[in-house]
């Protein structure tokens, strides 16, 4: 008897405690310290995990709840849950500190059928949403009655707020032509080909760089939105015969996929039907289009404009599409705390990191367009919560985040009305920032270090070099007290941008070309790395050329600059080292050497070993423009460059009289340069264009080999 009692006692002793596990499953298994933040702890969030599960022993609590609420109906329980959720939402609002405006955080997100519109304190929707729960309950009951009357009126008068979107499904009257949707379905590739384009895109370094759309969601939309026809006996593939959307007609899901297809298939020509479809989607303006897919679609369109080299050279063709992207994103609250704002509306948690990253890229694009066009940034500081961005950006986005904020701050100083910017100090701070945050330029100029994963870093480096070059030019134009270091920055920053462009172009071409020699046929028509290099060339090469030519023109026209350069020229010949954008200390770099270095950059691309790559130059419109601009500049400035004196052989020779004599000797040739400029560059167009521009067809043929 005693043995039985002892055995039962041991069993009771071995029972585990009902103490809940506080750490999430991931941290508990890997023995990591869990901060227990929900819905994602710090460890899971930093690793971009899609799940963060907490296993809790709640059996005792469940028993108590069952006893307490066993007589409650489901309706009463649902109402109680809504009240408690509302209280939790209000409690989660950030505490209002003394002196802080309580209205600044008064936000209401109206969500309906996956459409989201954000309202602020002066909106009646936000005011009503802050009322008591009892008032909200009665408001819903009143709205249901009003909604019945409204729907009856709509049916009687044949009115629909979806008429704008529905127009895409209707053929123009008396035209005999198909509707936009019918035309689109006729022009789309087979379903399997479209699926392959999407798969290629999500496997590319380009997608890894941006990650603004959720891969699994897009692939689900692919299955849900397209209706496949019968399988072709010839190809074994299915044609797309129609689209399958819900009653709210979110065509932006399809737009995201067709925009991705355009990016993945570049440089193949985009069918006219897809271009028309994209233009129509872009033109919608009613409140029925506030889908997150609309913001993604507009930004993907912006990316394609840059990938195809259609930005106008200075982002001027991107201004309106960028404005639409900003307006839609802000009115949907993408600049807010999405993890609090959207989770209360049952928005999928796995999509929120992509929306946060999308807003971060929109901020960077705003700076990029502002820098290129010379206009202040469009996104006001009120929409940029710096602390929130720093908390929620993943480790891969930190460089993008910090570079964007640094460049935004510089643009703010440039356009300030009250205080002129201290340009030398700004340039020095930006140089220190690049040293701290970036790998050195030498790293990216070494082909062995490039594998395609550095695409984001290259974009940020180019933007930083553009800013340094622009500020240096501005200082030279607006200040009489010239500075040798500033002058060197203005020459070497765009030169290094050109070095970076063409080194990446050559290296990425070799990366793709090495795959072509393999037996894999699917890679024989794909140039993913080269397309990324073209993106950098289109956006940065033309701009760098113009910056360098601006320096040459300043020298030709401004005698003060001529005198300053002659007085501060280095006694020893200074050879330009790619990767160095500072130059000799307290001495001006020779313009002759800079001009020769630029010639070497462009001559290198025409070497025999790069002959396959030069075919791109011969058949691309944008490349032809760049080549022609360089040839025109080479011929126009070559005469002036020959007459530039290298400066005094010793510092003792740099007297005022000798400098005046040098400038007088230069005056004649420079006047000849100005008077005979047109004669110098006139000639047969073939002297500048390697071939007649024949559109993109030949360019496409080259890539399809």
From Swiss-Prot:
A biological process from GO: DNA-templated transcription
Keyword set, alphabetical order: DNA-binding, Metal-binding, Nucleus, Transcription, Transcription regulation, Zinc
CDD domains: fungal_TF_MHR, GAL4
Location relative to the cell: Nucleus
GO cellular component, one term: mitotic spindle
PROSITE patterns named among the record's database cross-references: LRR, ZN2_CY6_FUNGAL_1, ZN2_CY6_FUNGAL_2
DNA-binding region of this protein: 24-52
InterPro entries: Leu-rich_rpt, Transcription_factor_dom_fun, Yeast_MDR_Regulatory, Zn2-C6_fun-type_DNA-bd_sf, Zn2Cys6_DnaBD
Protein name per Swiss-Prot or TrEMBL: Uncharacterized transcriptional regulatory protein YKL222C
């Amino acid at each position: 008897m005693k043995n039985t009692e002892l055995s039962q006692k041991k069993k009771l002793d071995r029972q585990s405690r009902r103490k809940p596990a506080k750490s999430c499953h991931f941290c508990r298994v890997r023995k990591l310290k869990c901060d227990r933040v929900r819905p994602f702890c710090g460890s899971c969030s930093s690793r971009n995990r899609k799940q963060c599960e907490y296993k809790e022993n709640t059996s005792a609590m469940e028993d108590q709840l069952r006893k307490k609420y066993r007589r409650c109906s489901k309706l009463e329980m649902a109402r109680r849950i809504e009240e408690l959720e509302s209280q939790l939402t209000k409690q989660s609002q950030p505490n209002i500190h003394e002196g802080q405006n309580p209205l600044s955080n008064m936000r209401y997100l109206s969500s309906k059928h996956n459409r989201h519109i954000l309202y602020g304190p002066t909106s009646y929707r936000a005011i009503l949403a802050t009322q008591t729960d009892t008032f909200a309950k009665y408001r819903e009951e009143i709205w249901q009655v009003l909604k019945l009357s409204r729907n009856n009126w709509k049916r009687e008068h044949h009115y629909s707020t979806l008429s704008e979107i529905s127009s895409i499904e209707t053929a123009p009257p008396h035209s005999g032509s198909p509707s936009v949707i019918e035309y689109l379905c006729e022009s789309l590739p087979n379903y399997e080909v479209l699926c392959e384009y999407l798969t290629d895109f999500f496997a590319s370094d380009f997608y890894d760089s941006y990650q603004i759309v959720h891969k699994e969601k897009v692939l689900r939309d692919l299955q849900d939105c397209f209706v496949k026809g019968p399988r072709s006996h010839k190809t074994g593939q299915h044609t797309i015969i129609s689209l399958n959307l819900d009653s709210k007609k979110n065509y932006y899901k399809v737009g995201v996929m067709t925009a991705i297809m355009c990016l993945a298939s570049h440089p193949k020509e985009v069918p006219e039907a897809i271009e028309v479809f994209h233009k129509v989607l872009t033109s919608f303006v009613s409140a029925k289009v506030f889908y997150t897919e609309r913001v993604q679609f507009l930004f993907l369109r912006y990316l394609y404009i840059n990938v195809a080299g259609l930005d106008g050279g200075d982002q001027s063709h991107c201004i309106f599409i960028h404005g639409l992207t900003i307006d839609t994103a802000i009115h949907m609250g993408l600049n807010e705390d999405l993890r609090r704002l959207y989770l209360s509306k049952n928005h999928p948690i796995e999509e929120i990191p992509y929306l946060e990253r999308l807003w971060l890229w929109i901020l960077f694009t705003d700076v990029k367009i502002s820098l290129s066009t010379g206009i202040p940034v469009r996104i006001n500081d009120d929409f940029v919560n710096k602390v929130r961005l720093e908390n929620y950006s993943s480790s891969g986005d930190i460089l993008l985040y910090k570079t964007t904020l640094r460049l935004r701050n510089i643009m703010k100083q440039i356009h300030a009305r009250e205080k002129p910017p201290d340009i030398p100090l700004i340039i020095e701070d930006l140089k220190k920032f690049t040293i701290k945050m970036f790998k050195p330029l030498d790293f990216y100029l070494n082909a062995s270090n490039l594998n395609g994963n550095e695409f984001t870093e290259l974009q940020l480096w180019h933007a930083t070099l553009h800013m340094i070059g622009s500020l240096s030019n501005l200082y030279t134009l607006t200040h009489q007290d010239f500075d040798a270091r500033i002058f060197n920055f203005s020459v070497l920053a765009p030169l290094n941008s050109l070095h970076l462009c063409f080194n990446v172009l050559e290296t990425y071409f070799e990366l793709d070309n090495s795959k072509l020699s393999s037996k894999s046929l699917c890679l024989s028509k794909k140039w993913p790395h080269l397309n990324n290099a073209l993106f950098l060339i289109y956006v940065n090469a033309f701009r760098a050329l113009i910056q360098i030519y601006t320096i040459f023109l300043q020298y030709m026209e401004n005698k003060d600059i001529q005198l300053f350069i002659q007085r501060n020229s280095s006694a020893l010949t200074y050879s330009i080292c790619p990767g160095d954008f500072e130059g000799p200390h307290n001495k001006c770099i020779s313009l002759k050497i800079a001009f020769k270095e630029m010639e070497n950059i462009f001559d290198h691309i025409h070497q025999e070993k790069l002959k396959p790559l030069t075919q791109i130059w011969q058949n691309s419109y944008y490349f032809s423009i760049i080549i022609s601009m360089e040839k025109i500049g080479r011929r126009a400035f070559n005469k002036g460059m020959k007459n530039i004196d290298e400066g005094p052989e010793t510092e003792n020779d740099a007297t005022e009289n000798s400098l005046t004599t040098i400038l007088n000797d230069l005056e004649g040739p420079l006047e000849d340069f100005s008077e005979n400029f047109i004669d110098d560059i006139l000639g047969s167009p073939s002297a500048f264009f390697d071939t007649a521009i024949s559109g993109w067809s030949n360019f496409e043929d080259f890539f399809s080999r």
